[in-house]
Amino acid sequence: MSRLSTALQLTDIDDFITPSQICIKPVQIDKARSKTGAKIKIKGDSCFEESESGNLKLNKVDISLQDCLACSGCITSAEEVLITQQSQEELLKVLQENSKNKASEDWDNVRTIVITLATQPILSLAHRYQIGVEDAARHLNGYFRSLGADYVLSTKVADDIALLECRQEFVDRYRENENLTMLSSSCPGWVCYAEKTHGNFILPYVSTTRSPQQIMGVLVKQILADKINVPASRIYHVTVMPCYDKKLEASREDFFSKANNSRDVDCVITSVEVEQLLSEAQRPLSQYDLFDLDWPWSNVRPEFMVWAHEKTLSGGYAEHIFKFAAKHIFNEDLTTELEFKQLRNRDFREIILKQNGKTVLKFAIANGFRNIQNLVQKLKREKLSNYHFVEVMACPSGCINGGAQIRPTTGQHVRELTRKLEELYHNLPRSEPENSLTKHIYNDFLDGFQTDKSYEVLHTRYHDVVSDLSISLNINW
């Protein structure tokens, strides 16, 4: 199974990176010099064959995600390349070591284990095990607690804050007429593609607001750490996400705190990896104890544990920001549900606000890399300037159909599965981001809304990764 989105895959990659040596950590092959030269062949059994030297068994290349991010050539895909520190095996290793340290009362090496659940994996696992969404969240808490987790949280508060920051960023850009079209930034597959393929041309248009995963990292490693009086470096923060590209995002150097000597997110596992863990345990999710998700942020718990944000399936950015901008820029209070018009396909839709016959707001949703490529080309030809904001997601249908969501059963089409997950999502209660908790977090921990501190911890930067033009990156659509 592919571990990263289609846009970040290198085609025809093998466990053993060949002597073309595109990777920055190549296999080192020592061989004697020959005046006559030699023929080289990588065989199917992983041997490096040279006609004069016989066969040499190659070692596997151990490449970390940070190596990939530092490389200007490719983003390596897949289980063939060993992704260290970002796997269910690493999580189990940490949990087992932590249990041993607790048993031996080695308190200096005991870590607080925090698990954060995104909404889409909860829906995927609820459908897989045929249980209600709220019960799926409770059973997941029971499962992770059985492994030794200390806290199991949802991303709700981070989702709320991401919308608050992104909508204000858009209004500021619109009023200043600066760097429009604004492009969403919560999808790491899209962001990495933008950095490596289009660089400084496209990056000024990308929203600087951190994704909910990385905002959650700040909340856990700073606010929760203060509340429970544990240093950030002693907290092991795991997120459960709908796509493998979130592993890349968590590994960015921008999200490593030198002050805390800690990453905001230490490990990312995915819906399908949780399913694999449950399968290996030979115990379905429904057989684990039911515990409400933890809510360490305030004394008042929300009525529900799993929430939707607007109608769209990837965080609700386009819909929420459109309504906010209509009200705060044009004094239009849009109380009815928004209807996006389908254009070329169901993954490219737009919505328009008109005043006095003139278009004043024009938003779009672009899912899937075919639409993203068309989007970028239009921007390059200056034909996209009439869009003010575009919600961009690498996966067709958005995060609900993330690359690491549980796959359809035999005989089931992916669209049928996606439709069922969409139904589950649309039946969730809607969160209103501007609430008492987000106000509390801004006022008590971030020095208020739109302050230097809030900008520092809730926004990020992007980097133009200069590619070697001799390297051909073949993207499969």
From Swiss-Prot:
Pfam families given for it? Fe_hyd_lg_C (PF02906)
The positions annotated for binding [4Fe-4S] cluster 1 are 23, 68, 71, 74
The record lists its disulfide bonds as: none
Amino-acid positions noted as binding [4Fe-4S] cluster 2 in the UniProt annotation, renumbered to this chain: 187, 243, 395, 399
SMART domains assigned: Fe_hyd_SSU
Q: Which InterPro entries match?
A: Cytosolic_Fe-S_CAF, Fe_hydrogenase, Fe_hydrogenase_lsu_C, Fe_hydrogenase_ssu
GO MF annotation terms:
4 iron, 4 sulfur cluster binding; metal ion binding
* Keywords of the record: 4Fe-4S, Iron, Iron-sulfur, Metal-binding
Biological process (GO), any one: iron-sulfur cluster assembly
**Domain of life of the organism in this record?**
Eukaryota
Listed SUPFAM superfamilies: Fe-only hydrogenase (SSF53920)
Record family assignment = Belongs to the NARF family.
The record describes the protein's role as: Component of the cytosolic iron-sulfur (Fe/S) protein assembly machinery. Required for maturation of extramitochondrial Fe/S proteins.
Q: Which PANTHER family match?
A: NITRATE, FORMATE, IRON DEHYDROGENASE
- Full protein name: Probable cytosolic Fe-S cluster assembly factor GD17698
